[in-house]
C-alpha cells in the first residue's frame, strides 16, 4: 500500500483560469491556437462567452456562478486525464482545486508534485507551494485539533457555565494557532 500522501492545492484556482484554456482542454492547445477565432469549436464559443461575463477579460473565472464550476471542471479534468493517462499517476483524488495523491515512495510523491506543476503550467496555472506537502502514512483519520475539540468534556447535566465556554473557546483558539488556520475556531463556534 501507499506509504505517503501528497496534499496539493492550486494557487487562486478560479481567478487564475485563463479563458483560452477552456478550448485548449477541449480541443488540444495546438489546434485551439490555430483556430482561435473559429466559433464552431465549442471550446472557443465557451471561451468567448466566459470573456463576455467579465467585460472581455481573458484571465479568471467569476467565483460563485455554477457555470464557473463547470468550466473549471473542464480544464481540471483535462489536467487529471494527463496526470493519469500520460504521466501514469493513478492514485489521484481531486476535490475542486485540492489534489490528494497516494504514493508508494517519497520519490514517487515528489515526481507527482513535479508533474502536477508541469501540467498546471501548460494551462498557465500554478501550485500553491504553501499548501503542497508530502505526509507519511498512516495518518490519523482526523486532524489533531478535531480530536481535541471533540474530546472536550462538557458537563453531563447540561448546565454550561461561562467558564466552560471560555475554556472550550481557549482550546479552539490554541488549536487554531497550532494549525495555522482559523478552521478549528470556526468549527468550535
What does each of the following model-derived ranges do?
Residues 106-167, 171-174:
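Polymerase palm active-site segment centered on the conserved acidic dipeptide of motif C
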Residues 1-96, 102-115, 158-189:
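Conserved polymerase palm-domain catalytic core
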